[in-house]
A protein has these predicted regions:
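Short linear sequence motif anchored by a di-proline
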Residues: 1-195
Length: 195
């Protein structure tokens, strides 16, 4: 992911003004800057429902702690059934805004080939569906994935769940049916080779 888009700057500023951003800084994480490539374990702006039910921007670390390292993704098809994700699926959903996401071409001969930047065909920002939970009093998230659209199967067999902007509130609201909201996800992407 690369939040270098000017549209993201205000979201990042809002995140960095929060009390949670101060807590992350005290724990050795730096607040996000609105440019550059983003990697797992980074603190990113995530949109979620507050305790009072309002849409808010929170800093969240990318990755659930797992026995073998960070879990950065969850399969949308099985998240509701998996113990690791079940509660978050039902009650703690978030959206991660980004300009692009990156993928590497994979083939049978080598682990990774060329790097590509992808985004929805007709959308500006990407609204990635995520799940979050608390670890050591700080929020952490995973990104939901789904089978890749036929147009990018040559690159990778999975892709993130990307929501239309008008479905963000529906996704983050506890009590709504997440499986139904995912049916509206965007699948057609445009891509270009990244440097």
């Amino acid at each position: 992911m690369a939040p270098a888009d000017p549209e993201l700057r205000e979201i990042v500023r809002e995140m960095n003004r929060s009390k949670l951003a101060e807590m992350f800084t005290k724990n050795g994480k730096e607040p996000l800057h609105a440019e550059g490539e983003i990697f797992p374990s980074a603190v990113l702006p995530a949109i979620a429902s507050s305790r009072s039910g309002e849409r808010r921007v929170f800093p969240m670390k990318w990755g659930f702690s797992g026995p073998k390292g960070l879990l950065i993704n969850a399969r949308a098809e099985t998240a509701a059934e998996k113990e690791t994700f079940r509660e978050a699926w039902a009650k703690h959903r978030c959206v991660i805004p980004a300009s692009w996401y990156y993928e590497w071409e994979h083939d049978e001969k080598k682990k990774a080939g060329r790097k590509y930047a992808l985004r929805p065909e007709k959308e500006g920002l990407i609204w990635l569906a995520g799940l979050y939970r608390m670890e050591n009093s700080l929020p952490v998230f995973v990104i939901l994935t789904r089978p890749a659209d036929d147009g990018i199967l040559w690159m990778h067999d999975r892709m993130p769940v990307m929501l239309p902007e008008n479905k963000v509130n529906e996704w983050i609201t506890p009590g709504n049916n997440p499986a139904q909201t995912i049916q509206t996800c965007l699948t057609r992407v445009r891509w270009e080779q990244a440097v």
